[in-house]
Amino acid sequence: AWVRAAQMQSATLEELVQLQHANETARHRVVGLVIETRPDAVTPDALTLIRQLGATKIQMGIQSLDQQILDSNDRGIRIERIQRAFELLRAFGFKIHAHAMVNLLGATPESDKCDYRSLVTEAPYQPDEIKLYPCALIEGARLCRDFDSGAWIPYTEDALMDVLAADVLATPSFCRISRMIRDFSSNDIKAGNKKPNLRQMVEQR
């Protein structure tokens, strides 16, 4: 069944081009296609192919622009590579949807505010959309040992709300915040925010 499903969802580039042309005059058209990737996978060759596939927007997990925080959380990427990814995406004409995370290991409320402000206001970043997540600890994650040792402590609800409210206010009008929590069951979250209406709470603050 899986093989048959995969075959039904496969096509050659030639077949794709034919469908793209048909889409141009279709009554109900596909007007946007989003692909998610890592900043270090963004290259001219990759973007050329992604553009051929018809994508119009790229999502990337940035999480932080603080090199020390990236290293502490084993992100395995340099700030310079993230900058290059943004520059390439702009050059290729893609909309950019970045993911940012507060309360990572090594972060503080003030460093989070500064970090986010840099992401949304400074060149070469300034994404078109943002997913703004508070770090939530899931059982089995490497962060569990840092939580158990006291090296990582989740923000209090008041501190988290303060950070997120500041981030919302720092977001330029051209940038849309599309999401503010991850889709995890509260039963799976060992530590961190469990409020499903967190964004509503922040916006009412």
Spans of features found by a protein language model:
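C-terminal accessory regions of radical SAM enzymes
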Residues: 151-205
